[in-house]
Amino acid sequence: MALYEHVYLARQDISAQQVEALTEQLKSVIESFQGKVTKVEYWGVKSLAYRIKKNRKAHFSLLNIEAPAAALTEMERQMGINEDVLRFMTLRVEEHEQGPSAMMRKRDDDDRGERGERPRGPRPERGERGERGERGPRRPREDNIGEEGLY
């Protein structure tokens, strides 16, 4: 059986429990075709880069799947019908990533808290540069710019 990573976005106005129920429904579809879901990650509600079906935020979830192609076809068909699913993407992979995904590692890094000021190192004072001096007269302004069609 082939290995897949499947990410889907669910509407922001449904609860986390409803997202879990949707994930369980997808798992049951995969298992009905003798496949298995090896890992499930809920990434939380995140802002979208642009509006999708009038939503600015969405619940993000990742599934690592080991299943035949027919199982994926049926799962994607059901996701297309479900109004709570905004987008989904399934990628075939050679092997599943061990441990937490990159998104979960990034979220853990964000939870480190305030780190305080960082050392800046030695820097010259701004006053050491000296005066700029006179800039000189400006060149005369051309009044015929509009006549040339530049503006």
UniProtKB/Swiss-Prot annotation:
Residues 105-144 have a biased composition (Basic and acidic residues). InterPro entries: Ribosomal_bS6, Ribosomal_bS6_sf, Ribosomal_S6_plastid/chlpt, Transl_elong_EF1B/ribsomal_bS6. GO terms for cellular component: cytosolic small ribosomal subunit. The keyword Ribonucleoprotein applies. Residues 94-151 are annotated as: Disordered. One of its GO terms (biological process) is translation. NCBIfam families: S6. Belongs to the bacterial ribosomal protein bS6 family. HAMAP family: Ribosomal_bS6. This is Small ribosomal subunit protein bS6. The lineage of its organism: Bacteria, Pseudomonadati, Pseudomonadota, Alphaproteobacteria, Hyphomicrobiales. The gene is rpsF.
